[in-house]
Regions:
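Short, compositionally biased
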Residues: 1-124
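C-terminal, surface-exposed recognition/capping segments
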Residues: 1-10, 110, 125-127, 133-169
């Protein structure tokens, strides 16, 4: 059984006979399941064991998005094209990388960067996406040493049909 609760994935390995005896609704409503916000993050830029990557910062709730921990994968894809030259109005959010990535994938199956990010898995987490423009800015401010200084990093925030916002370090 796998539960996804407020940006935290919980994996339970139980025999199938035990599943019939568990009232998951009661467990969740009792508050006994810890969310990612009950965990203490490591120092900025350090690998967060069990969370799938390096902790960057905690973003407050902003413009309709919930508060969330920003975690970057420990693996980078090199030399991926951003995607085809297609205007994707749903990929213009400065803050919501998940929404942008989903929009890019919906608009084109040939979007190599969005496809790579959405298929990435680590520490049992499979909810990765391309970073938004704000996510990359926070990485620049909070953990620049994690990134190559000779490279530009694509965001999921599309600027035009031919370009997205990028960040250098």
């Amino acid at each position: 059984m796998q539960l996804h609760i407020a940006h935290a994935t919980i994996n339970l390995q139980l025999p199938s006979s035990a599943l019939e005896q568990i009232d998951v609704t009661n467990i969740l409503s009792s508050g006994s399941v810890a969310s990612a916000f009950d965990l203490t993050p490591p120092a900025r830029g350090k690998y967060w064991a069990g969370q799938g990557g390096h902790y960057i910062c905690t973003q407050p709730a902003l413009l309709g998005l919930p508060a969330r921990h920003v975690i970057f994968s420990s693996t980078e894809a090199k030399d991926l094209a951003f995607g085809p030259s297609v205007d994707v109005p749903g990929a213009r959010s400065q803050l919501d990388g998940r929404r942008n990535t989903d929009a890019l994938l919906s608009a084109s199956r040939d979007h190599a960067a969005a496809k790579w990010a959405s298929e990435y898995q680590a520490d049992g987490h499979s909810d990765f996406h391309l970073p938004s423009r704000m996510d990359l800015l926070m990485a620049y401010v909070c953990a620049p040493s994690l990134f190559e200084t000779s490279s530009w990093y694509w965001s999921s925030t599309q600027l035009s049909r031919n370009c997205a916002f990028v960040q250098d370090f």
